[in-house]
A protein has these predicted regions:
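Beta-rich, aromatic/charged-enriched effector core domains that present basic-aromatic interfaces
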Residues: 84-175
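Surface-exposed, flexible loop/turn segments at secondary-structure boundaries
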Residues: 16, 39, 79, 109, ...
Length: 175
């Protein structure tokens, strides 16, 4: 059994080959891409959507493997005994003697809460990082919105357009 210091979780909607995680290979890092029953049952999904989602995960795992990264891709059959994501993370971290678990901030509140609780309860070093697939980093969102204040998204979108020069011509909106 190979020992890995770091376990990096890749969720199914985080298949971004441009993420900074993949700029450098590290033999001490194991990337985990796992199909989980909990992700099929929390809301009704069309079977073709699930198949496409899992196929994309498998293809991403294969691409990372081909690029020389250590990747563990687990199918639904492989994770059948894991009741949820946290149980899976504990099992894999224990199996590979990982000291650190890293994950990218989930887009869904449900998973964000699950992983935040795991982070606070775990004896392992658990680190959350940005997904890098949005214009605005996750940690900057709090600076854009005042707590307990009504927010109009129109103003937020205008500020984003100006900051990133999207649909702006001569400092004026084009669309």
């Amino acid at each position: 059994m190979t020992h890995h210091k770091t376990l990096r979780l890749i969720l199914g909607d985080q298949l971004n080959p441009s993420h900074s995680w993949y700029k450098q290979k590290d033999d001490d890092t194991l990337y985990l891409i796992a199909e989980l029953k909990q992700e099929t049952d929390y809301v009704k999904h069309h079977i073709q959507k699930l198949c496409a989602f899992f196929n994309a995960m498998e293809n991403f795992a294969t691409a990372l493997n081909t690029a020389g990264f250590n990747v563990l891709h687990l199918t639904l059959d492989d994770t059948d005994d894991d009741k949820d994501l946290i149980e899976l993370l504990k099992r894999i971290a224990d199996k590979y003697q990982c000291e650190t678990i890293e994950y990218q901030y989930p887009d869904e509140f449900r998973l964000k809460s699950q992983l935040a609780k795991f982070k606070s309860d775990s004896s392992l070093n658990v680190i959350a990082t940005d997904t890098e697939h949005f214009l605005l980093p996750f940690t900057d969102i709090k600076t854009r919105f005042t707590k307990n204040k009504h927010v109009t998204m129109e103003h937020f979108y205008r500020a984003m357009r100006k900051q990133f020069n999207i649909l702006i011509d001569d400092a004026k909106p084009t669309g």
